[in-house]
């Protein structure tokens, strides 16, 4: 990895580590709001999400500022915007009156009843920040071409934010997905996308030990932010056709998640299962393969401290 990309990864790792240490000294009220109990009955914290999101975004902004101020601004808007509304859903979505508003159907039902769910706020916030970020990325000069390019970039950014979040259902899974997705984007180019992918890599590697050790959880704040940053990296590098194909793939995965259990698919696929279980603690009460219900968006379970989806291993963020 050339010096610039190594520098972005190292800065993200250092910033994430420093924020992790600072998070241990948060006021009791904040610590309690971020506290959860996992399926083992052990305390975990959602502080991993904000610290990882901030560490990755800071390094990505610095890494791209010398390449393109517009890309650096897009990185900041997408990363911080997704982290902010994700944190809102992590905390507010844990309230008893919000626990039934899960999945897109749950958000729509809440709106029909005259309520705005925390998840709906998050979806709107991620979409809005993705649209602003997309408008800052390279686009055609004609009005119509610019509108198409912006819409495609925004779809890639918002879609990536949501898809990474879909995998935050087991310790380390979303971080591994983020690292695998960042891999191809580390190849050097002049757009600045490699610096963004490097920042995500450094932050994810730093967060991985505590996540695998079930001491902390990524939650919506972290998963949405890392996904949004990867979306910016991809949209910055790709042309219109590449953005369209990537957007279609992400939308397809989101649609599939409403019908298919990603956990069950991973459990039935030996190679994916091996990667998924690498580094994790020995299972205690995890369900057998194929038990989880269809449609398990992490955004809908990350903030529920006392309830769980049928077939998922237990209460707490990420359904863990």
Model regions and ranges:
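C-terminal membrane-associated helical module and adjoining short loops/tails
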Residues: 239-320
């Amino acid at each position: 990895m050339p010096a610039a990309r190594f520098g972005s990864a190292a800065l993200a790792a250092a910033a994430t580590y420093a924020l992790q240490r600072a998070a241990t000294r948060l006021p009791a009220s904040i610590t309690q709001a971020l506290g959860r109990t996992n399926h083992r009955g052990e305390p975990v914290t959602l502080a991993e999400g904000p610290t990882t999101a901030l560490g990755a975004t800071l390094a990505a902004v610095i890494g791209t500022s010398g390449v393109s101020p517009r890309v650096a601004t897009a990185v900041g808007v997408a990363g911080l915007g997704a982290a902010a509304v994700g944190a809102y859903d992590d905390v507010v979505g844990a309230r008893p009156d919000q626990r039934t508003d899960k999945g897109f159907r749950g958000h729509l039902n809440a709106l029909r009843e005259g309520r705005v769910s925390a998840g709906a706020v998050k979806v709107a916030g991620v979409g809005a920040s993705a649209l602003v970020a997309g408008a800052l990325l390279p686009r055609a000069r004609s009005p119509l071409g610019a509108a198409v390019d912006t819409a495609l970039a925004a779809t890639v950014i918002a879609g990536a934010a949501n898809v990474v979040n879909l995998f935050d259902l087991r310790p380390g899974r979303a971080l591994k997905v983020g690292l695998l997705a960042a891999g191809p984007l580390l190849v050097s180019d002049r757009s600045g996308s490699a610096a963004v992918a490097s920042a995500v890599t450094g932050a994810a590697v730093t967060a991985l030990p505590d996540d695998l050790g079930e001491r902390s959880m990524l939650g919506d704040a972290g998963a949405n932010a890392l996904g949004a940053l990867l979306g910016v990296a991809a949209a910055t590098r790709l042309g219109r056709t590449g953005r369209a194909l990537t957007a279609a793939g992400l939308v397809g995965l989101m649609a599939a998640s409403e019908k298919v259990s990603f956990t069950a698919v991973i459990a039935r696929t030996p190679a994916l299962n091996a990667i998924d279980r690498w580094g994790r603690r020995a299972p205690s009460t995890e369900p057998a393969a194929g038990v989880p219900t269809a449609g398990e968006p992490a955004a809908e379970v990350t903030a529920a401290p006392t309830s769980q989806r049928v077939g998922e291993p237990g209460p707490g963020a990420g359904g863990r």
